[in-house]
Amino acid sequence: KLMTLIKSISGIRGTIGGSPEDGLNPLAIVKFVAAYATFIRKNTKVETNKIVVGRDARISGPMVKQVVLGTLTGMGFDVVDIDLATTPTTELAVTMEGACGGIILTASHNPKQWNALKLLNEKGEFLNAAEGAEVLRIAAAEDFEFADVDHLGKVIPNATYKQKHIESVLNLDLVDVEAIKAANFRVAIDCVNSVGGIVIPDLLYALGVKEIFKLHCAPHGNFSHNPEPIPENLTEISDLMGHAKADVGFVVDPDVDRLAIICENGEMFNEEYTLVAVSDYVLSHTPGNTVSNLSSSRALRDVTVSYTHL
């Protein structure tokens, strides 16, 4: 089998298995995590010695996590293990814990044989290009040193962050739970057999949605279809929308940092307009600037500009 290991400024990703330089396996993981820990120790701006680790529901997740936990504690860091969690939840946990960094174990929308390590700073944000390059340099040079027996870290399991994240959403001024309850929405969801299945239903119930039609919510990591949320992979939920007479459908990728919205007629609401629609709502209540990524459409700019006269 052809194995792949891709090293980039945003982390490492690869197919599980292979020789140390050819796949994502324990030796590759140890080297890279030790380099990240060395980088954090030299550069962190916070006093704590904690790093948060969360993962999606990939089959390889438990193995990768054990190697990551062992390496971080071997480098002298205490690890807050939040286990199965969405990428945004792990990012939130870093700041809530006052941690000096975080590692997310997910290959996002890649197929099940892939996994990856995504690296966060103390703000719960991804490392920038220069920081990522420095981690790669440390890894290549093996310029790291493990802790002695009196300075090993410990693992701190913490299963509270799913609920903390849901509560932080409910506490947002712009989230009108009463309006959602009153609408009596019928909602279909497809969570592609990963961590969306353990958080999206609970979030919807907390928002007052009573009728949820679930597809692939068991988080076993054997993805029921190609996990990238694009139209050709979403035929099943489109069919369900009609049978269930659902008002809206939501599809997430394995680590829940991508969202596809399905309209009541079963067609996909164009992904690049999701941000535009949300921005329109936010700006109508709190006018101001928006920040976009390179894949955002011009429509976001147009919506933002339309509110500048208010």
Question: Which ranges hold each PLM region?
Answer:
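An N-terminal, well-structured beta->alpha segment
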Residues: 2-70, 74-75, 155-185
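Gly/Ser/Thr-enriched, mixed-charge loops and adjacent short helices
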Residues: 15, 115-244
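N-terminal small/polar loop signature for handling phosphorylated ligands or for N-terminal nucleophile
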Residues: 38, 50-114, 202-261
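Conserved beta-strand elements of the Class I
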Residues: 52, 101, 187-188, 291
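Short, surface-exposed alpha-helical segments at coil->helix boundaries
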Residues: 61-66, 132, 197-201, 301
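Short active-site oxyanion
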Residues: 78-79, 186, 287-290
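Acidic, glycine-rich loop-and-beta core segments that form the ion-binding/anion-interacting portion
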Residues: 231-302
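Conserved small/polar residues in nucleotide/adenosyl-binding loops
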Residues: 308-309
